[in-house]
């Protein structure tokens, strides 16, 4: 695929606007239009969907989303150098691209959505990717304002997102992600597809929010998983002491063997312990 629209090639856009990637902003630009189109398609039909894109840079994925038929794209970009390039795309797709010059970590899109169907699709800046994902997974109330996320991460982070009990990568992020969403790694992207090429493989992950996750206080769940995984090699009867209650009694009340280690406990087990923690502290 040489072009998806009649706008200039991305390499020309980079030169025109002096948009060479900055490591300080976690930027790795994806120039391959086959791949940007594949990411856009992974988000499903978009003709009645508003897409939130974080860190669009020169706009390769932005163009793919619009060309694929997204009703509207709200692009949040911190790098002021990218704004003129994005404005050029907005002129090509009048009324369909809204550009927000700001910090994605503090951006709340809900006032702009007005009840519209929304999805988050992004090649996330690697230096804030986990922070952003954790924030989206922590939205209250749940289900959230978005019905899907299709996001690119470093492969190691992607493995942590989809991990479940007894997986080597299983940890706090995997518990939160799979408690609140169905997760799947869709495909990998090699370093050579990016400019500059990162040192590791990247992966595109889909997260579909669960309509009714197991009933639990998110804060209590975070407390339990933090205690358990901060000392992941220790048995729960040791690691859960940080919670300020009898750890063995907590685990047993939740139906979890207190001699188990965090990496072997299911999400349902952590939810049960979080619920018992609230009762014990009441």
UniProtKB/Swiss-Prot annotation:
Organism field: Afipia carboxidovorans (strain ATCC 49405 / DSM 1227 / KCTC 32145 / OM5)
HAMAP family: 16SrRNA_methyltr_A
Protein name: Ribosomal RNA small subunit methyltransferase A
Function: Specifically dimethylates two adjacent adenosines (A1518 and A1519) in the loop of a conserved hairpin near the 3'-end of 16S rRNA in the 30S particle. May play a critical role in biogenesis of 30S subunits.
Gene3D superfamilies found in the cross-reference section: Ribosomal RNA adenine dimethylase-like, domain 2, Vaccinia Virus protein VP39
Taxonomic path: Bacteria, Pseudomonadati, Pseudomonadota, Alphaproteobacteria, Hyphomicrobiales
GO molecular function: 16S rRNA (adenine(1518)-N(6)/adenine(1519)-N(6))-dimethyltransferase activity; RNA binding
Subcellular location: Cytoplasm
Signal peptide from the UniProt entry: none
